[in-house]
Amino acid sequence: MKKIMVIGAGGIGSFLIPLLDRVNEYEINVWDDDIVEKKNLSYQDFYEDDVGKHKTDVMSYRYRNVKSHPYRVLTKKQLMGYDLVICCVDNLELRRLLYLVDTEKIKWLDLR
């Protein structure tokens, strides 16, 4: 099974994760330190019962191939060991980090 890192389980990530899970060929590691809030319900794939829970925990509960990492990605070391890193956040600091990595070692996509 290929290992994929999805950074961000919000507006983009919450809809991408079920699509990746459906393929059933990936171990999907979701990284996001955010908690579901009521304001997220209108544009993210979460429900009233999810409010107050970590977004990554909700995704790992719903989908069999998802592992929860309710943390912020801060270092290049955290990006290592994955076949593909998919960035689904609009955090400029994190995106700068991605643009500085050795693309021979880390393959990544920026979906923002």
Q: What are the residue ranges of the model-derived segments?
A:
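Adenine nucleotide-associated cytosolic modules
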Residues: 1-112
